[in-house]
């Protein structure tokens, strides 16, 4: 559970702003905003989603900074509540909607701060997923970097040895690698994984639309990745019940339960949310399915006024230029309030926004 995950991290006082009040858009306003989101998704050529702990609360895994989040309750001297374990948690409607959006080619890449493993267990392809803070079900060989996805949590945290050895042989007839396997869960001071960070950074830079779901965007560098889309002329949509660090940069802000927002979005796009039939690990994306017919999106309102601070969508953005291919140095989890350093940031305690 996220409770055990949080307890396993090193002590750290600055965990960001916790327990901020939740905001709910009125039903009519929520509907207008989701229609606008559907237009943006349909008209964009490279859509990247960024997910945080808020997308897993419906599965029984508590978040961290919400009204009843792990760190919010900790600040109040109360014990957090939990309803499930990582092994028994089921992917939510949001998890499965993201699977389908990728299948039909409407989702280019997925960046997650969550460690609960629900994206992988939902069947989302791992080659289109960056898990910046690790995965409770994954261990990696310290020697050859082969990763193993397990059926149960690996049992350690902080990139520690799990007690198992790598069984991969480089060629037929050769002896197994036998490198030491380590968990992939970061502690506050650990550097983000190079591969995942490089992929997330490149995808965010090349996106013409970034959508954040269930994250307060307080942890750097993960929380700043959506801004790379804005800097390259793309659009940013934030879906969260609480205020986020980057609200002022958003073209559209939606305050509603993420499952409700994603369910409405899929309906407007003419897509079904697939049922989950058990854990399924997909290493590489399958050939995309045909896109559904062009949805009959509601016409925009004539008024150019902002919707609760959001900017109405303009003409379709041209795809951003390709990233030059340089890989950023592995930053570390830093405090959410500290200014962005010029050197690779550290994953400081306020950063772990696990699921």
From Swiss-Prot:
Effect on the protein of changing residue 330 to A: Does not affect ability to promote DNA repair
What does the note under cofactor report? Binds 1 zinc ion per subunit.
Which stretches does the entry tag as region Disordered? 284-355
Q: Which organism is it from?
A: Homo sapiens
Q: Which residues carry this modification: N-acetylserine?
A: 2
Positions of the site: Formation of an covalent adduct with nitro-fatty acid activators? 18
PANTHER family xref list: NAD-DEPENDENT PROTEIN DEACYLASE SIRTUIN-5, MITOCHONDRIAL-RELATED, NAD-DEPENDENT PROTEIN DEACYLASE SIRTUIN-6
Q: For this protein, what reaction is catalysed?
A: N(6)-acetyl-L-lysyl-[protein] + NAD(+) + H2O = 2''-O-acetyl-ADP-D-ribose + nicotinamide + L-lysyl-[protein]; N(6)-tetradecanoyl-L-lysyl-[protein] + NAD(+) + H2O = 2''-O-tetradecanoyl-ADP-D-ribose + nicotinamide + L-lysyl-[protein]; N(6)-hexadecanoyl-L-lysyl-[protein] + NAD(+) + H2O = 2''-O-hexadecanoyl-ADP-D-ribose + nicotinamide + L-lysyl-[protein]; L-lysyl-[protein] + NAD(+) = N(6)-(ADP-D-ribosyl)-L-lysyl-[protein] + nicotinamide + H(+)
Q: What is the effect of changing residue 263 to P?
A: Found in cervical cancer; somatic mutation; reduced histone deacetylase activity; slightly reduced the protein-lysine demyristoylase activity
EC numbers listed for it are 2.3.1.-, 2.3.1.286, 2.4.2.-
Residue numbers of N6-acetyllysine PTMs:
33
List-wise, which residues carry Phosphoserine?
A: 10, 303, 330
Q: Which GO terms describe its molecular function?
A: chromatin binding; chromatin DNA binding; damaged DNA binding; DNA binding; DNA damage sensor activity; enzyme regulator activity; histone deacetylase activity, NAD-dependent; histone deacetylase regulator activity
The observed outcome of changing residue 89 to S is: Found in non-small cell lung cancer; somatic mutation; reduced histone deacetylase activity; does not affect the protein-lysine demyristoylase activity
Functional note: NAD-dependent protein deacetylase, deacylase and mono-ADP-ribosyltransferase that plays an essential role in DNA damage repair, telomere maintenance, metabolic homeostasis, inflammation, tumorigenesis and aging. Displays protein-lysine deacetylase or defatty-acylase (demyristoylase and depalmitoylase) activity, depending on the context. Acts as a key histone deacetylase by catalyzing deacetylation of histone H3 at 'Lys-9', 'Lys-18' and 'Lys-56' (H3K9ac, H3K18ac and H3K56ac, respectively), suppressing target gene expression of several transcription factors, including NF-kappa-B.
Q: What is the effect of changing residue 33 to R?
A: Decreased acetylation level
User: Could you say what the effect of mutating residue 25 to N is?
Assistant: Found in non-small cell lung cancer; somatic mutation; reduced localization to chromatin; reduced histone deacetylase activity; does not affect the protein-lysine demyristoylase activity
Mutating residue 316 to R has which effect?
In 4KR mutant; abolished sumoylation, leading to increased H3K56ac
Q: Which residues are reported to carry the modification Phosphothreonine?
A: 294
Q: Where is the Deacetylase sirtuin-type domain?
A: 27-272
Q: Describe the family membership recorded for this protein in Swiss-Prot or TrEMBL.
A: Belongs to the sirtuin family. Class IV subfamily.
> What name goes with this protein?
NAD-dependent protein deacylase sirtuin-6
């Amino acid at each position: 559970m996220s409770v055990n995950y949080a307890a396993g991290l090193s002590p750290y006082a600055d965990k960001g702003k916790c327990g901020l009040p939740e905001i709910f858009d009125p039903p009519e306003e929520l509907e207008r905003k989701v229609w606008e989101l559907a237009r943006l998704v349909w008209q964009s050529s490279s859509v990247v989603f960024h997910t945080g702990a808020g997308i897993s609360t419906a599965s029984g895994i508590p978040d961290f900074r919400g009204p009843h989040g792990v760190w919010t309750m900790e600040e109040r001297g109360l014990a957090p509540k939990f309803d499930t374990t990582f092994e028994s948690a089921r992917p939510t409607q949001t998890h499965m909607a993201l699977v389908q959006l990728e299948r039909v080619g409407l989702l280019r890449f997925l960046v997650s701060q969550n460690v609960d493993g629900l994206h992988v267990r939902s069947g989302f392809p791992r080659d289109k997923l960056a898990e910046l803070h690790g995965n409770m079900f994954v261990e990696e060989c310290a020697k050859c970097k082969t990763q193993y996805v397990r059926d149960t949590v690996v049992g350690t945290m902080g990139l520690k040895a799990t007690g198992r050895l790598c069984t991969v042989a480089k060629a037929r007839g050769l002896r197994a690698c036998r490198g030491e396997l380590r968990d992939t869960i970061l502690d506050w001071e650990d550097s983000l994984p190079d591969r995942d960070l490089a992929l997330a950074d490149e995808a965010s830079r090349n996106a013409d639309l970034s959508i954040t779901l269930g994250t307060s965007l307080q942890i750097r560098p993960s929380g700043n990745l959506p801004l790379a889309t804005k800097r390259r002329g793309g659009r940013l949509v934030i879906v969260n019940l609480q205020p986020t660090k980057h609200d002022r940069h958003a073209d559209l802000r939606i305050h509603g339960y993420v499952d409700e927002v994603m369910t409405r979005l899929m309906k407007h796009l003419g897509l079904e949310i697939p049922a989950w039939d058990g854990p399924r690990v997909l290493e590489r994306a399958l050939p995309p399915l045909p896109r559904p017919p062009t949805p009959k999106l509601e016409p925009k309102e004539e008024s150019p006024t902002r919707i609760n601070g959001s900017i109405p969508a303009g003409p379709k953005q041209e795809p951003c230029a390709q990233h030059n291919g340089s890989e950023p140095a592995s930053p570390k989890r830093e405090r959410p309030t500290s200014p962005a350093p010029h050197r690779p940031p550290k994953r400081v305690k306020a950063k772990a926004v696990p699921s």
